[in-house]
């Protein structure tokens, strides 16, 4: 009696392949789908059990704010209200903001609505002011691929705790350590990651020294065949996020390496 829907997990940035089993409007369980390039046959506990909170914390009705309080309204009334507001608001005063859990199809539809219909380019999806340079596609992709972690011989973690933020990715790092004894470094002590790693001094000067070939790690990165640098959300949200992001992006220009 369960309806089975194949989809992608949104609990982290890994994009694990999953199957969601539903009965009527209720999500009953979430199971992994095999994808050797991403999650293999695994999913994290967060992915598996997040549906438990949907019964009491699921928004499936539009809300409108009146006198400081949110009230439920019908979809038809919501669209009417949106149309009224848009008709009396100049394009340069209309802003679109999509949430972290918004799917790509919806985001693309919102982009078309703003650019082609409303003549507005004020769109964003970064509620936390995360710095990302979109000029180069490699700036926002995981360039080695999740599966490519297993081929890496050096990994540098900057501002991330992969065990907490992306469990499946962390399991890949552990796998490559056990298989290849890969050297792993972190800009800060983030606790037990289930594999050993060396902690560097936690400040942006260390990154600067590495880029300028003035740090012991510079030679290791340069001599590694497939080094990987992984940037986390916390570092991109920090005041030094823009500098660190751009500095790391140009590492392959200052160090002779095949960096991912």
Predicted feature locations:
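Generic solvent-exposed, charged/amphipathic alpha-helical segments
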Residues: 83, 248-249
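Single conserved hydrophobic/aromatic residue that forms the stacking wall/gate
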Residues: 250-260
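Glycine- and acidic-residue-enriched helix-capping/strand-helix junction motifs
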Residues: 238-245
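N-terminal export/assembly segments and adjacent metallocofactor-ligating motifs
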Residues: 1-216, 223, 233-235
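Short amphipathic C-terminal alpha-helix that caps PH/PH-like domains
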Residues: 210, 247-248
């Amino acid at each position: 009696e369960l309806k089975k829907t194949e989809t992608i997990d949104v609990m982290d940035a890994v994009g694990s392949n999953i199957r969601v089993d539903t009965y009527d409007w209720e999500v009953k369980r979430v199971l992994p789908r095999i994808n050797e390039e991403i999650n293999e046959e695994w999913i994290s506990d967060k992915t598996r059990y997040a549906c438990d909170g949907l019964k009491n914390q699921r928004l499936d009705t539009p809300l409108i704010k009146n006198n400081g309080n949110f009230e439920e309204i019908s979809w038809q009334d919501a669209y009417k209200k949106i149309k009224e507001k848009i008709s009396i608001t100049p394009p340069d005063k209309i802003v679109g903001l999509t949430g972290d859990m918004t799917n790509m199809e919806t985001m693309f539809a919102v982009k078309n609505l703003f650019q082609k219909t409303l003549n507005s380019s004020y769109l964003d999806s970064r509620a936390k002011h995360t710095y990302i340079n979109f000029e180069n596609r490699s700036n926002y992709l995981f360039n080695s691929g999740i599966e490519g972690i297993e081929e890496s011989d050096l990994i540098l973690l900057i501002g991330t705790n992969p065990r907490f933020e992306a469990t499946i990715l962390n399991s890949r790092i552990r796998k490559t350590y056990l298989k290849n004894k890969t050297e792993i470094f972190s800009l800060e002590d983030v606790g037990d990651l289930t594999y050993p790693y060396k902690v560097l001094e936690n400040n942006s000067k260390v990154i600067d020294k590495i880029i300028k070939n003035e740090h012991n790690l510079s030679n290791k990165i340069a001599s590694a065949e497939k080094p990987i640098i992984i940037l986390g959300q916390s570092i991109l949200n920090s005041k030094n996020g823009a500098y660190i992001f751009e500095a790391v992006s140009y590492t392959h220009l200052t160090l002779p390496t095949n960096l991912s």
